């Protein structure tokens, strides 16, 4: 049975940011957790699927491999022998959820990692094929340079929370059960800021715009993402920063169309060139090259120019340029031209092209047979 798509399992889009994935995971894990569905085998299987999808989609390397190859990326030990069994620290997801419900509190919450950011970058085809370095300016939250992320006024320190005594959790009794909950006073941090920093007002972060130099590798295409680790928003109170994802969008080109690593273009030629053959110049991304057109060439014929396409960003052979010939009907003919064409037309045997146009003859023969069959 084919495995379900990881994004569909979590109910998120393929461009979802990490915080969206975490939010979806929390909601589904709560619903299907074995402690809430004891003896329900279907819920247990669903929970395993959710857990597996979460582990892949929150790991940037695994997610990139999955986006490119799907489930095949992890077959035959593709996950380094570990599979999906362990290795992910699910306490950071469940601590504030299942700790509150089942009493399995994990103590003080860690300060939240900074949010990931996304920047949409538009490139020309030439830039995408050759690679380019671009400067971008993004609005973000950066660590406060006065309190260095602590949120406290310089010369002071955050104070231990008097409600939870620094544990980040409080215990509530409900009948025979003792249930641990996140401390409502400090929101689980275990500390309070009595003298907040004047610049960030106790948040530890300030709004700023920053300029980054982004190196785009040669061969990228629409939909590719480039990850800049640690260039997202600063984390809360000194926690690690998030990442910045640059999403590539390649503009439409007036001459070339790209399909994978191959480029396509249409090359118009006149009737005489198509009939007699000859040599023409065609464009490539590296300049003009000569193309030999044989006689009796028809519209739609493809000529392949090897190695004139795109070099894959993931390595491998360079693609090709495929030129599709379009035989163009001449316009602006004078009387002499028309007379010559009339004579040529008659020499072909009229509209059926009996002698020189086998496709025309075949077409008209087919039309005649069609009407003959109708009148029988």
From Swiss-Prot:
It comes from the Bacteria. Keywords: Chaperone, Cytoplasm, DNA replication, Metal-binding, Repeat, Stress response, Zinc, Zinc-finger. Zn(2+) 2 binds at residues 161, 164, 183, 186. Binds 2 Zn(2+) ions per monomer. Its main location: cytoplasm. PROSITE patterns: DNAJ_1, DNAJ_2, ZF_CR. GO terms for biological process: chaperone cofactor-dependent protein refolding; DNA replication; protein refolding; response to heat. PANTHER family: CHAPERONE PROTEIN DNAJ, DNAJ HOMOLOG 1, MITOCHONDRIAL-RELATED. The J domain is necessary and sufficient to stimulate DnaK ATPase activity. Zinc center 1 plays an important role in the autonomous, DnaK-independent chaperone activity of DnaJ. Zinc center 2 is essential for interaction with DnaK and for DnaJ activity. Participates actively in the response to hyperosmotic and heat shock by preventing the aggregation of stress-denatured proteins and by disaggregating proteins, also in an autonomous, DnaK-independent fashion. Unfolded proteins bind initially to DnaJ; upon interaction with the DnaJ-bound protein, DnaK hydrolyzes its bound ATP, resulting in the formation of a stable complex. GrpE releases ADP from DnaK; ATP binding to DnaK triggers the release of the substrate protein, thus completing the reaction cycle. This is Chaperone protein DnaJ. It comes from Shigella flexneri.
């Amino acid at each position: 049975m084919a495995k379900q798509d990881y994004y569909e399992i979590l109910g998120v889009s393929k461009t979802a940011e990490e915080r969206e994935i975490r939010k979806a995971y929390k909601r589904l894990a709560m619903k299907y957790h074995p402690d809430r569905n004891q003896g329900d085998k279907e819920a247990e299987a669903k929970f395993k699927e959710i857990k597996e999808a979460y582990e892949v989609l929150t790991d940037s390397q695994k997610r990139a491999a999955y986006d490119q190859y799907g489930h095949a990326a992890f077959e035959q030990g593709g996950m380094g022998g570990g599979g999906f069994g362990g290795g992910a620290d699910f306490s950071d997801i469940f601590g504030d959820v299942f700790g509150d419900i089942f009493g399995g509190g994990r103590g003080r919450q860690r300060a939240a990692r900074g949010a990931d950011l996304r920047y949409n970058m538009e490139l020309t085809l030439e830039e995408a094929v050759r690679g380019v370095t671009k400067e971008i300016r993004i609005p973000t939250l950066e660590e406060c340079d006065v309190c260095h992320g602590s949120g406290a006024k310089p010369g002071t320190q955050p104070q231990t929370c008097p409600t939870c005594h620094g544990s980040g959790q409080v215990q509530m009794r409900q009948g025979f059960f003792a249930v641990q909950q996140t401390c409502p006073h400090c929101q689980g941090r275990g500390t309070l800021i009595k003298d907040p920093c004047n610049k960030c007002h106790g948040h530890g972060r300030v709004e700023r715009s920053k300029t980054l130099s982004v190196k785009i590798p040669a061969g990228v295409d629409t939909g590719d993402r480039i990850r800049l680790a640690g260039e997202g928003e600063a984390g809360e109170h000194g926690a690690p920063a998030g990442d910045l994802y640059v999403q590539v969008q390649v503009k439409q080109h007036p001459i070339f169309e790209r399909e994978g690593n191959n480029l396509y273009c249409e090359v118009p030629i006149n009737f005489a060139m198509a009939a007699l053959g000859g040599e023409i110049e065609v464009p490539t991304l590296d300049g003009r090259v000569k193309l030999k057109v044989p006689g009796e060439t028809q519209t739609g014929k493809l000529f392949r120019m090897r190695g004139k396409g795109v070099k894959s960003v993931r390595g491998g052979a360079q693609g090709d340029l495929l030129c599709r010939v379009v035989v163009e009907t001449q316009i602006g003919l004078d009387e002499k031209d028309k007379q010559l064409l009339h004579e040529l037309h008659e020499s072909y045997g009229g509209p059926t092209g009996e002698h020189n146009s086998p496709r025309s003859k075949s077409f008209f023969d087919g039309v005649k047979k069609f009407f003959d069959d109708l009148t029988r």
